[in-house]
C-alpha cells in the first residue's frame, strides 16, 4: 500500500519492534502464571457446565476447591485428568462429585502424566471437533452467500432481556446491520463468575451467558438465511472472566469479541497481573475459533483528550497487535480500535480525525479496524448528532475502516429505539454508497495539515513505545500514561487469584489451539 500520508516506515518498524519487545517481556510473566478464570475456562472446554443448588457455576465450584486445596498451580486439566484416571468419571461427573462432597481432589493419589493425558485427550478432541464444526459452519455460510465488501455496519442492542434483544437484533439485521453486539449488563466485568441460563433482567445491557449466546446465534442465523447473508454476533470478553467468555463464544459460534489487553486494568480496576494472564488465553481461544477481536483504544478518549492523546491510542494499537501475535492470532482477526472523539468546537478536527484514521489504515493494512462513533461531544441535539455521525461515516469510508459502530442521534439521551438504529443505518448506507470510491480519488497535500498531523502522532507514539520498552508495561500503567488513568501493580481486583504454575502444570487447549484456526 502506497502511503498517502508520506509516513516514515522506519518509525513504524521501530514502533512495532518496541511493541514486540514489550509483549515478549510480559509474556515471560504470563507463561509462569495462571489464574482462577483461566482454569475455569479449561473446565468449561472440558465440558463442565451447569450450576449447583446455590446457583454457583460448577466450573467455579471445581476451581474454588482447587484453590482451597492449594492445587490451582497444577491446573484444572491435571487435577481433573487425575480424578478421571482414579474414578473413571468424565469431567462433568468429577465436578458433580466435588460439588456433592463425594470427591476431594486433594486426597487422590497422583497418577502419571501419561495416564492423565490419555484420560483427558478424548475430551479435548471432542471439544475441538465442536469448535471446528462452528468454524466450518461460518465458513460455509460465507462461501454460499459471500462476505460484505466495505465497512461492516455494526449496531448494539442493550435491553437487559435476551428475548427483547432478539426482537431488536432481528429488526436491525433486516434493516441492514452486518454485526449485532449484545451489550453486557452494567458491572458484569466485575463478577468473578459467568451467570447461567437465559436472562431477562439486566441493567444497561444483558448478561453474557452461554444460553444467551446460543439463543441470539440461532436468531441471527434465522435472519441470515432469509436474507442470504451472514450476520455476525459480537459480545464482550473483558473483565474478570475473559477466557471463560471466549470459550463460551467459541462453543456457540460468536464471530466478534471485545478483547483488549489493557481495558480491564484501566477502566475496571482489575489487577494488571490478572488481566495480562487472562487476555493471553482468551486470545488463543478467539484465534482458533476464527473470531475477530476488537480492542478498546476508543475508551482512552473518554478520559483523555483525543487531540493531545492521539499518540497513546496508536501506541496501544501496536501493543495490542503484539499481544495478539504472541497469542498466535492472524492480522485479519485484529480489530484494532480507535474513535471519532475530537472536540468539534476545535478548528480542523475533521482533518485530524481523517489523519488518525488513514494513519491506522496504512500502519495496520491487514487489520479489520474497529472505528467508534462520537459519544463524548454528543449533546442531545439530535440534528447536530446526526451530522456528527455523518462526518464519522465519511471518515470511515474514506479510510476503509472495517467494523463501523454506527453512531446514534439519540446518544446521551436514551438507549436507542429501533427507529434510531434504522436512521443510523440509512445514514451510513447513503454515505458509503455515494462515496464508495472517493478515498481512492484523494491524495493529501505534502506539508499539509493531514500529513503533518499523522507524522507527528507516529513520531510521538514511537518515542512513547521506546520509553515503555525501557520501563516495562506494568510500570507504564502505574504512571498513568494510558487514558490518564494510574493503576498500581499490586492493586485492583483479582490479584489473589493469580498463582505461579507448578512443574506438572499443562493447558491442553493452548497446546492444540495456539497459532491455528479451526476448520
Where are these regions (language model features)?
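Hydrophobic faces of well-ordered beta-strands that scaffold small-molecule active sites
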Residues: 151-158, 179-183, 229-237, 256-261, ...
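Alpha-helix-loop-beta-strand connector modules within alpha/beta enzyme cores
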Residues: 143-144, 194-232, 276-293, 350-367, ...
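Glycine-rich phosphate-binding active-site loops on the catalytic face of alpha/beta enzymes
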Residues: 178-189, 252-269, 320-321, 392-415
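Long, compositionally biased, glycine/small-hydrophobic-enriched stretches that function as flexible linkers
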Residues: 1-163, 171-176, 184-212, 239-245, ...
Amino acid at each position: 500500500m502506497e502511503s498517502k500520508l508520506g509516513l516514515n516506515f522506519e518509525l513504524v518498524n521501530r514502533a512495532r519492534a518496541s511493541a514486540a519487545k514489550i509483549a515478549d517481556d510480559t509474556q515471560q510473566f504470563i507463561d509462569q502464571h495462571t489464574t482462577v478464570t483461566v482454569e475455569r475456562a479449561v473446565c468449561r472446554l472440558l465440558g463442565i457446565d451447569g450450576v449447583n443448588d446455590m446457583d454457583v457455576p460448577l466450573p467455579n465450584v471445581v476451581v474454588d476447591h482447587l484453590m482451597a486445596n492449594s492445587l490451582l498451580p497444577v491446573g484444572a486439566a491435571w487435577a481433573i485428568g487425575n480424578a478421571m484416571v482414579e474414578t473413571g468419571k468424565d469431567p462433568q461427573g468429577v465436578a458433580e462429585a466435588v460439588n456433592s462432597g463425594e470427591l476431594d481432589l486433594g486426597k487422590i493419589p497422583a497418577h502419571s502424566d501419561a495416564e492423565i493425558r490419555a484420560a483427558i485427550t478424548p475430551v479435548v478432541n471432542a471439544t475441538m471437533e465442536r469448535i471446528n464444526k462452528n468454524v466450518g459452519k461460518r465458513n460455509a455460510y460465507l462461501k454460499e452467500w459471500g462476505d460484505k465488501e466495505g465497512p461492516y455496519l455494526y449496531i448494539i442492542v442493550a435491553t437487559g432481556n435476551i428475548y427483547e434483544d432478539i426482537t431488536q437484533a432481528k429488526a436491525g439485521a433486516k434493516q441492514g446491520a452486518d454485526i449485532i453486539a449484545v451489550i453486557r449488563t452494567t458491572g458484569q466485568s466485575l463478577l468473578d463468575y459467568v451467570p447461567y441460563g437465559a436472562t431477562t433482567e439486566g441493567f444497561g445491557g444483558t448478561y453474557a451467558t452461554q444460553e444467551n449466546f446460543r439463543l441470539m446465534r440461532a436468531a441471527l442465523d434465522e435472519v441470515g438465511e432469509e436474507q442470504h447473508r451472514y450476520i455476525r454476533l459480537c459480545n464482550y470478553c473483558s473483565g474478570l472472566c475473559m477466557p471463560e467468555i471466549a470459550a463460551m463464544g467459541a462453543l456457540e459460534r460468536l464471530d466478534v469479541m471485545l478483547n483488549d489487553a489493557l481495558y480491564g486494568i484501566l477502566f475496571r480496576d482489575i489487577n494488571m497481573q490478572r488481566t495480562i494472564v487472562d487476555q493471553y488465553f482468551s486470545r488463543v481461544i478467539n484465534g482458533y475459533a476464527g473470531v475477530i477481536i476488537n480492542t478498546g483504544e476508543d475508551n482512552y478518549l473518554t478520559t483523555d483528550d483525543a487531540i493531545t492523546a492521539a499518540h497513546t491510542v496508536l501506541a496501544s494499537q501496536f501493543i495490542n497487535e503484539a499481544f495478539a501475535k504472541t497469542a498466535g492470532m492472524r492480522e485479519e482477526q485484529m480489530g484494532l480500535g480507535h474513535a471519532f472523539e475530537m472536540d468539534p468546537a476545535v478548528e480542523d478536527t475533521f482533518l485530524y480525525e481523517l489523519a488518525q484514521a488513514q494513519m491506522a489504515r496504512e500502519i495496520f493494512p491487514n487489520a479489520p479496524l474497529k472505528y467508534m462513533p462520537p459519544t463524548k461531544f454528543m449533546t442531545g441535539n439530535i440534528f447536530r448528532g446526526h451530522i456528527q455521525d455523518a462526518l464519522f461515516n465519511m471518515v470511515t469510508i474514506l479510510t476503509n475502516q472495517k467494523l463501523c459502530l454506527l453512531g446514534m442521534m439519540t446518544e446521551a439521551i436514551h438507549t436507542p429505539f429501533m427507529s434510531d438504529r434504522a436512521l443510523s443505518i440509512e445514514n451510513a448506507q447513503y454515505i458509503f454508497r455515494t462515496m464508495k470510491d472517493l478515498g481512492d480519488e484523494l491524495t493529501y497535500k505534502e506539508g499539509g495539515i493531514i500529513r503533518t498531523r499523522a507524522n507527528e502522532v507516529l513520531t510521538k507514539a514511537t518515542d512513547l513505545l521506546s520509553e515503555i520498552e525501557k520501563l516495562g508495561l506494568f510500570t507504564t500503567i502505574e504512571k498513568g500514561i494510558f487514558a490518564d488513568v494510574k493503576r498500581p501493580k499490586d492493586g485492583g481486583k483479582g490479584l489473589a487469584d493469580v498463582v505461579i504454575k507448578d512443574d506438572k502444570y499443562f493447558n491442553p487447549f493452548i497446546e492444540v489451539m495456539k497459532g491455528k484456526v479451526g476448520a
